[in-house]
A protein has these predicted regions:
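Gram-negative outer-membrane beta-barrel transporters
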Residues: 413-421, 430, 521, 526-531, ...
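Surface-exposed extracellular loop regions of Gram-negative outer-membrane beta-barrel proteins
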Residues: 110-111, 259-263, 268, 309-311, ...
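Flexible loop and strand-edge segments within Gram-negative outer membrane beta-barrel domains
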Residues: 228-230, 248-298, 309-345, 385-386, ...
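Periplasmic-side early beta-strands and strand-to-turn transitions of outer-membrane beta-barrels
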Residues: 161-163, 169-176, 180-280, 631
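Acidic, small-polar-rich N-terminal luminal/periplasmic segments of exported/outer-membrane proteins
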Residues: 24-164, 184, 511
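C-terminal beta-signal and adjacent terminal beta-strands/loops
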Residues: 213-216, 474, 527-533, 580, ...
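Outer-membrane beta-barrel signature, preferentially recognizing the C-terminal barrel domain
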Residues: 270-296, 344, 395, 399-403, ...
Length: 715
């Protein structure tokens, strides 16, 4: 059966990949895991999946999560200038609609404080140098991954000891130094791997230090809450122990410790000083047991227990001298230093068991998952002026979330493996139990759902394959969507809770074609998703000068679009000099609610062209990338704030950004890389960064022309 003959040689399907060499041009497929929970070749996967390898991350000189997806149309980041990466957007679906996995473990959730950045909490903590690959499922994957995967999955996989132990060696590793003028950042990375008989170990550490983004801001004309100066640091420690007990049993241990800090000077016209100190600590521990059972009900049983503890603390200090005016609670005759101490904590326990069984032309995958999360979210306000009371703000109650899932999938190979049909079904139960620390009596929430999926691939010829799928999605509302309360009428903003929210449901359709030859690789896919009870934040009422917001269920929403990618190896195609390749990829998405209003979460269409050259001796190479983003204006924007839009929303101009990178290997194990980014020094913006703004504020622009350099030594 096809499962027993997988070829893991990678082709250059990501846009930044430089070409391989003529002897290696048999364009075999990458192996993906997240889309089917099995090791499946991409060509036999009935879904759009993008794979970004560690090689591509290196070639792009990515130094943070934002830059990992820089050249992946259809995938964008939502970020905060103060706190960095927040959530991932896939085809207009974002936040808790996109499931984030690291080594198969669900990550802590994000928290969106609306207009108040000091109470945001990120859902992503990962360092690019630790990654072996990133898999992106574009579209609903609830039947395999549960509630949070209604909009897709991003699966990060960290490196293993075997990635550094070459040719049977018992010791290996790498050391890397890098610098970027984009934010004046330095990083140091080291990884050490060992083999002691049947035990393999890995210890890897990365340190990063940087400053604020060097963009097109005008320091003399800043808007309130703009970051003026910033110092950042990040520490990431990864430890793995993998022990092959015997032929039947393997056990793996993992520990990851992450600490991110930033200190920001923030501009605000109403304060003499305004600072923010943000610290995130996240610890992840996991143990996995693999049993090669070769039994009647399973060939392999994989069991995993993971625990993640996250604590995010943001301290905001703002000083207002004595005198009348904003804010109104500052007495006229007293100075006041106000300190807001915000804390978000989440402890998540996840247990999962998966059984794999091959029976004739069937490959069965079935199992169960259980997740328990304890979440806390509070803010304490202290005032140096004794006439102003200290206050405790509880934006959401302490909450306990529980998720339980059962899943089964069958990959059926027919017609001598030309046709593969993959039905799957999953049952999910979700519950949220709010605590009593808000002083209010809040109702519990629980819901259950059965979701299904039917996918298929059919090999038309030796080089052409069509694929398609119909998949259902389900997402229960998160604790903050149910209970988030922010009452600040003095600033004209109130967010009301809505514990009566319903779960979102969806049905998605996708149809595509893949074509692989010795000289080219192409894919085109069209997709359509229909959502019911779509959860959106809208204006519910206006009372005097106060606007009330709340999360509500919209009757429906639709998202549709098309994506295309093509890689050409020009030496094989037309006899050009060896090592020349191009890669083109484009993504177009549009979305609207049931009333025909545009979904502002949908990004404008985007296309990237990469021109690559690798010298035949593999000692040097270069890549030129053109990244085009279309404008977003007019009917593509929802200006109605009562249906989830933004009144007065600024329009986004189109932009073309040019990046140039190169590498040189003066010796076998030493690689020096350099790059010039935004080569033409174009002032440009990302749609996600200006959503909600009434004009293009320069402090929200992307980096001006900048350069980066790195040196990596492998041993």
């Amino acid at each position: 059966m096809y499962k027993q003959s997988l070829l893991s040689a990678s082709i250059v399907l990501a846009l930044s990949s430089t070409s391989a060499f003529a002897d290696d041009y048999a364009l075999f497929d990458e192996v993906v895991v997240s889309a089917t929970r099995t090791n499946q070749t991409l060509i036999n996967t009935a879904a759009s999946v993008t794979v970004i390898s560690d090689k591509q991350i290196e070639e792009n000189m990515a130094k943070d999560v934002n830059e990992i997806f820089e050249y992946t149309p259809g995938v964008t980041m939502n970020s905060s200038s103060r706190q960095g990466a927040q959530t991932i957007n896939i085809r207009g679906m974002e936040g808790k609609r996109v499931k984030i996995l690291v080594d198969g473990s669900s990550q802590p959730g994000s928290f969106d404080g609306g207009p108040y950045a000091f109470i945001n909490s990120s859902g992503i903590s990962i360092d690019p140098d630790m990654l072996k690959s990133v898999e992106i499922i574009k579209g609903a994957a609830s039947s395999l991954h549960g509630s949070d995967a209604i909009g897709g999955v991003v699966a990060f996989e960290t490196k293993d000891p075997s990635d550094f132990l070459k040719d049977g060696e018992d010791f290996g590793g790498q050391a890397k130094l890098s610098y970027s003028s984009e934010d004046n950042s330095f990083s140091e990375h080291v990884a050490l791997a060992n083999r002691f008989g049947d035990l393999e170990t890995l210890v890897a550490y990365t340190r990063r230090d940087g400053e604020e983004l060097q963009n097109f801001r005008d320091s003399n004309n800043l808007e309130n809450y703009a970051v003026e100066d910033q110092d950042t640091s990040a520490d990431n420690l990864l430890v793995k122990l993998q022990y092959q007990l015997n032929e039947s049993h393997r056990i793996e241990f993992l520990a990851e410790l992450i600490k991110d800090t930033s200190d920001s000077d923030i501009y605000h016209s109403s304060y003499d000083s305004y600072t923010g100190a943000d610290d995130t600590e996240q610890n992840r521990f996991a143990i996995k047991h693999i049993w090669f059972a070769d039994g009647a009900i399973a060939d392999t049983v994989t069991s995993k227990v993971s625990y993640i503890s996250k604590e995010e603390n943001g301290v905001t200090k703002r000083f207002k001298p004595a005198g009348p005016g904003f804010p109104p609670y500052v007495p006229a005759n007293n100075d006041n230093l106000q300190t807001k101490d915000y804390e978000y904590t989440e402890d998540k326990l996840e247990i999962e068991t998966q059984l794999d069984k091959e029976i004739n032309n069937h490959y069965l995958v079935y199992g169960a998952t259980y997740t328990h999360s304890d979440i806390s979210n509070t803010n304490m306000e202290y005032n140096s002026d004794t006439a102003t009371d200290d206050k405790l703000y509880v934006y959401t109650p302490d909450a306990k979330e529980q998720k339980f899932g059962l899943f089964v999938q069958d990959e059926i190979s027919l017609m001598n493996d030309k046709l593969i049909v993959t039905p799957g079904v999953r049952f999910d139960h979700f519950s949220t139990d709010p605590g009593k620390n808000t002083g209010e009596s809040l109702t519990d929430f629980s819901d259950s759902a059965v979701t299904g999926r039917l996918g298929s691939t059919y090999k038309l010829t030796d080089t052409g394959t069509i694929f398609g799928q119909i998949s259902q999605g389900f997402r229960a509302p998160s604790f903050d969507e149910l209970y988030y309360t922010y009452d600040n009428p003095g600033h004209g903003y109130v967010n009301d809770p809505n514990p009566d929210l319903k779960s979102e449901t969806s049905i998605s359709y996708e149809l595509g074609y893949r074509h692989n030859t010795q000289a080219s690789s192409s894919e085109i896919a069209a997709y359509y998703s229909d959502y019911d009870d779509f959860i959106e934040t809208v204006v519910t009422k206006k009372v005097g000068g106060t606007t009330h917001y709340s999360n509500v269920n919209l009757d429906s929403a639709t998202i549709k679009g098309v994506e295309f990618s093509n890689t050409l190896l020009w030496d094989v195609l037309v006899g050009a000099p060896k090592g020349i390749s191009t890669h083109f990829v484009a993504s177009y998405t549009e979305g609207e609610d049931g009333n025909g209003n545009a979904l502002n979460s949908v990004n404008p269409w985007n296309a990237v062209l990469g021109l690559n050259y690798d010298a035949p001796n593999q000692n040097w190479g270069t890549s030129l990338k053109l990244n085009y983003t279309a404008n977003k204006s007019g009917s593509d924007i929802n200006f109605d704030d009562e249906s989830g839009g933004n009144a007065g929303q600024a329009e986004l101009p189109s932009a073309t950004v040019v990046d140039l990178t190169a590498y040189y290997k003066p010796m076998k194990d030493l690689t020096i890389r350099g790059g010039v980014f935004n080569l033409t020094n174009e002032e440009y913006y990302r749609w996600n960064d200006i959503r909600g703004d009434d004009e293009l504020y320069k402090e929200n622009s992307q980096a001006e022309r900048n350069y980066g350099i790195s040196a990596k030594y492998e041993f």
